Amino acid sequence: MEQNPQSQLKLLVTRGKEQGYLTYAEVNDHLPEDIVDSDQIEDIIQMINDMGIQVMEEAPDADDLLLAENTTSTDEDAEEAAAQVLSSVESEIGRTTDPVRMYMREMGTVELLTREGEIDIAKRIEDGINQVQCSVAEYPEAITYLLEQYDRVEAEEARLSDLITGFVDPNAEEEMAPTATHVGSELSQEDLDDDEDEDEEDGDDDAADDDNSIDPELAREKFAELRAQYVVTRDTIKAKGRSHAAAQEEILKLSEVFKQFRLVPKQFDYLVNSMRVMMDRVRTQERLIMKLCVEQCKMPKKNFITLFTGNETSETWFNAAIAMNKPWSEKLHDVAEEVQRCLQKLRQIEEETGLTIEQVKDINRRMSIGEAKARRAKKEMVEANLRLVISIAKKYTNRGLQFLDLIQEGNIGLMKAVDKFEYRRGYKFSTYATWWIRQAITRSIADQARTIRIPVHMIETINKLNRISRQMLQEMGREPTPEELAERMLMPEDKIRKVLKIAKEPISMETPIGDDEDSHLGDFIEDTTLELPLDSATTESLRAATHDVLAGLTAREAKVLRMRFGIDMNTDHTLEEVGKQFDVTRERIRQIEAKALRKLRHPSRSEVLRSFLDD
């Protein structure tokens, strides 16, 4: 039963009081597991020393021990001091709930790697990937898929660079790195997809260079060799069976030929996933059969495993189970039809793959072991280089992202670097990983730091513009104009103006204005949706003046003008509509309107309204 930190420390102090001394080994044994920080341990040792309990490398002799006991016995406040030690340590433990500190503490427990350690881990990653690659080579669908893709390249329906990145020379003195792949990667599927998108963007820029770097004649020769070996292997398996020594030899040769191809990660991952999907189909049917027999018919699981294993697609195991004349045997008749359907689906999988279910499982098992080996090695490489991420992330603080977010993005870049690292090139991993970490952090800042998101390519243009603008400021002693910036950057002036407009940072409406900080920026921004006080007062005065002027006309004339011009009404009216209202012709309404307007144009009346006309 584990002791809590308080009881462990009490035991340590009590033991020290009884002995008069403590050894470093005893302190280490009795310290709570939470306390791993060297500063905390030193503080505890110092407090124990202050209590009169000496902390030594080894147990002292009898004379020294007697002196130590005398010293300890004279300390009447030992118990109180022990309580102080406990309270200070417990408060220190309580303060370690900060995520950054906890992350740093856990990270500090992993030792840094030497160059030899990096090479050792990189080789283990390669071993795991090689094991996966050998497993894929035994999967007939993988070879046929690769040959089909090459036929598309020959028909100019696809690019060779989308299929392979090159070939491994089997005659080279040192074994070359296997296919670059995401096998065993610590990255999430979303990050892997982003990585592939970036690779595709880069690939579109220099696709011609990539295709030229792969010799088409060599590719034709290698694919012809793969096709020929595949045909020989397939015919041998068909004639003698997969378990025959000759067939195993041909499978090994096919695997060696397949390993010479350095596939694009996307293609290799597709082959691995297709095998995994096939295995999932097998498992689904097997689980269904087991559920029908064990859960529904109450067949003992031990009996089911004994009969089913090795006879997955045969009906003999099911017939044997029925023939056992057990209480559950009769119930198997009820599920016979469903079991037959599942067995038929398993036989269909065997026809599709050209492998038995047992062989599919064996290939998938070896592939999973290789993946696990690569994953463990990649995890070790990542954990040993977490300090590198923090050292780089520190330089990018106060740029819009929290420190933990910077670390997280840097870790994603680190994991990408682990996936792509090739130790044979001679440089240390940290040299290579620094670029990936820095790129991941800068991209995340560009993508997430701004309130209004700006595309990454535009961020790069803004940074370039700011850099050139600072240079020109130093040269000319003043801010450069957009025309001067356009000339220096070889860009159209209107684009420079757009970039300058985009580069402006949004500002808070709550930004205080003035020394008293009582007013905010939002108080000084005009609300265009509301009417200005001056316009409102002018409109009200015009309404009052219009009413006064109309009051000088007859009631009939005033109403005609009100209806014709929509004064104090929702809308204006036509002559026809006004005529119907007064039960007269439209011509009579026009005459009344003309007469009323002539009266209004008289200086005694028009002078009041003329002041409202705009200059």
Swiss-Prot record:
GO terms assigned for molecular function: DNA binding; sigma factor activity
Record carries keyword Membrane: no
InterPro entries assigned to the protein according to its UniProt record, in alphabetical order: RNA_pol_sigma-70_dom (IPR014284), RNA_pol_sigma70 (IPR000943), RNA_pol_sigma70_r1_2 (IPR009042), RNA_pol_sigma70_r2 (IPR007627), RNA_pol_sigma70_r3 (IPR007624), RNA_pol_sigma70_r4 (IPR007630), RNA_pol_sigma_70_non-ess (IPR007631), RNA_pol_sigma_70_r1_1 (IPR007127)
Residue ranges, annotated region (Disordered): 177-215
Ranges spanned by the short sequence motif Interaction with polymerase core subunit RpoC, renumbered to the chain: 405-408
Subcellular locations according to the entry: Cytoplasm
Portion annotated as DNA-binding: 575-594
Family membership: Belongs to the sigma-70 factor family. RpoD/SigA subfamily.
Region (Sigma-70 factor domain-2) residue spans: 381-451
CC per GO annotation: cytoplasm
Quaternary structure, from the entry: Interacts transiently with the RNA polymerase catalytic core.
Any Gene Ontology biological process: DNA-templated transcription initiation
Originating organism: Salmonella typhimurium (strain LT2 / SGSC1412 / ATCC 700720)
Annotated region described as Sigma-70 factor domain-4, given as residue ranges: 549-602
Gene that this sequence comes from: rpoD
Biased composition (Acidic residues): 188-214
Key words of the record: Cytoplasm, DNA-binding, Sigma factor, Transcription, Transcription regulation
Stretches the record annotates as Sigma-70 factor domain-3: 460-536
Descriptive protein name: RNA polymerase sigma factor RpoD
Function, in words: Sigma factors are initiation factors that promote the attachment of RNA polymerase to specific initiation sites and are then released. This sigma factor is the primary sigma factor during exponential growth.
